[in-house]
Amino acid sequence: MSSPARPFTVRAPASSANLGPGFDSLGLSVPLYTTLRVTPQDKAEVVPLGTELADTPADESNYVYRAMTLAAKRAGRTLPPARVEIETEVPLARGLGSSAAALVAGVVAGNELLGRPLDDETVLDVTAREEGHPDNVAPALFGGIVVATLDKLGTHYVRLDPPAHLGVTVLVPDFELSTSKARAVLPREYSRADTVHALSHAALLAAALAQGRLDLLRHAMQDYVHQVWRAPLVPGLSDILEHAHEYGALGAALSGAGPTVLCFHDQRGSTATLHHYLHDVMTKNGLSGRVMDFPIDAAGTVVEHAK
């Protein structure tokens, strides 16, 4: 017997996490999307589409489908069967939250199939616990800029509207860097000085973003917790962190675990000089890739039902 539920689409954005000192706690939403088209039917069917997903499973072991079952598990229900078509614009293993977009889209889709038994805060908690940190899933779910923590008591967050005129320029190199490899190079312990530096700059960055103090971004985005250790894995990163402001960037950071690098820019001005500089850095380091400008996505994950 077929399900009476209507088909629907879930669209979850990419994200850029850390933004320098906000390690595992601060991120923003980028308008590149993972899209699921879900059609309730008598049996489960998973259909990855496009070249980015050519190597992903076309069955219930697919990460998106497994994410859908997480919603059912949290709700104490069985996931209704459906055909799930998956497409993504988010480059994989580049530090733009491809796994978080897939996870959030899947949990939201599973929740939708079940009739929305989970509220947004529970969806956030499910996804943050699955990822192990909330800095990508929170902006993917809510859009904008999000400060979030994950602990035994739950997942807590504050969403910030993007400051007026703040845009992002991303350099996406044509090589992959796994999060596990990027985490493996980090030290097990940090000095008191580096800890204080991280705390103070993360707090300043959150406050600057909340109040639209674009003039403080370059200083607030300084970081000694992860970028200095990951720089050898991303040719040209140190150059960009030190010099991007000379070419119009308001601040620069490794995006998530990399290798993508994010620069903030003022949308009222031209980014041509910054683009030229970033392409020069890639050329100097024997890399190829793309440089793109984006606004910060404000909507987060969106569900649309067929009419």
From Swiss-Prot:
One Pfam family in the UniProt entry: GHMP_kinases_N
Major localization listed first in the record, in broad terms: cytoplasm
GO (cellular component) term, any one: cytoplasm
GO molecular function: ATP binding; homoserine kinase activity
Transferase keyword on record: yes
Record localization: Cytoplasm
Signal peptide: none
Protein name as annotated: Homoserine kinase
Phylogenetic classification of the source organism: Bacteria, Thermotogati, Deinococcota, Deinococci, Deinococcales
Keywords, comma-separated and alphabetical: Amino-acid biosynthesis, ATP-binding, Cytoplasm, Kinase, Nucleotide-binding, Threonine biosynthesis, Transferase
Membership in a protein family: Belongs to the GHMP kinase family. Homoserine kinase subfamily.
Organism: Deinococcus radiodurans (strain ATCC 13939 / DSM 20539 / JCM 16871 / CCUG 27074 / LMG 4051 / NBRC 15346 / NCIMB 9279 / VKM B-1422 / R1)
InterPro entries recorded: GHMP_kinase_C_dom (IPR013750), GHMP_kinase_C_sf (IPR036554), GHMP_kinase_N_dom (IPR006204), GHMP_knse_ATP-bd_CS (IPR006203), Homoserine_kinase (IPR000870), Ribosomal_Su5_D2-typ_SF (IPR020568), Ribsml_uS5_D2-typ_fold_subgr (IPR014721)
Role this protein plays: Catalyzes the ATP-dependent phosphorylation of L-homoserine to L-homoserine phosphate.
GO biological process, alphabetically ordered: threonine biosynthetic process
Chemical reaction(s) catalysed: L-homoserine + ATP = O-phospho-L-homoserine + ADP + H(+)
Residues the record lists as binding ATP: P91, L92, A93, R94, G95, L96, G97, S98, S99, A100, A101
Enzyme class, broadest EC rank: transferase
Pathway assignment: Amino-acid biosynthesis; L-threonine biosynthesis; L-threonine from L-aspartate: step 4/5
UniProt-listed Enzyme Commission number(s): 2.7.1.39
